[in-house]
Amino acid sequence: MTKAHILILTDLDGTLLDATTYSYEAATGALSAIQTLGATLILVSSKTRSEMEPLRLRLDNRHPFIVENGGALFIPMGYFPFPLEQAAPRGDYEVVEIGTPYVRLRTALKEIGRDLGCRLRGFGDLSLEEVSDLTGLSPAETLLATQREYDEPVVVESNGMAWNRLSAAAATRGLRWTRGGRFYHLMGGNDKGVASRRLIAWYERRAQQEGRALITVGIGDSPNDLPM
């Protein structure tokens, strides 16, 4: 009987990485076990592509990855032996964009704050020093974290602002909120689950071609990981 292939989709901060130090040292045993099993580890995060690429290099992870709460999938060129629906070439990747362009999110955030009379500060409103203070990232890491394309982390600075009012204001603009470990995130119709299911379908197709079963595992620690 052909051995089943194991596909593991993991969040980063607070899951694979320490929530405070961003180190994966505590996960080295698990990473070794994954390698021994021949399983595939997919990184799924609210982080930007610019943040995730250096981490992939350090982990020697050459598999597809999902950025900015499912805003886009980045698949190494030629990774799957068949054409990928809705994928466009970009450098070394085939990219499937699911999320809303960042410039539209920025415009909507300003409108929502004005309409609700509350102070909503996204990464685009904060200095690099402020983002660094809020996240604990180094200056170099902070610069990478602010290179957003599909998702805006937001600090809600109005006491007592009802979640349903924020949700409704986003929904009227075709957008939605989710909650991560540190921030609210304003985004489009994407989430980690939408992107993960798209990717899993391709792995299932490849597994069928190889005559293998596919076992999927999702790991996370925050509400934005639940769809995964």
Show which residues each predicted segment covers.
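Asp-based phosphoryl-transfer active-site loop
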Residues: 4-21, 221-224
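Conserved acidic, metal-coordinating active-site core of Asp-based
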Residues: 112-217, 224
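Alpha-helical scaffolding segments of alpha/beta enzyme cores, especially the outer helices
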Residues: 29-32, 54, 165, 198, ...
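Glycine-rich beta-strand-to-loop/alpha-helix junction loops that act as flexible
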Residues: 69-70, 219-221
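Short, hydrophobic beta-strand segments that form beta-sheet elements in well-ordered domains
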Residues: 43, 217-220
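Hydrophobic "anchor" residues on beta-strands that sit immediately upstream
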Residues: 7, 64, 217
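Active-site phosphate-binding/coordination module
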Residues: 25-122
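Short, small/polar residue-rich loop motifs at catalytic or cofactor-binding pockets
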Residues: 2-5, 60
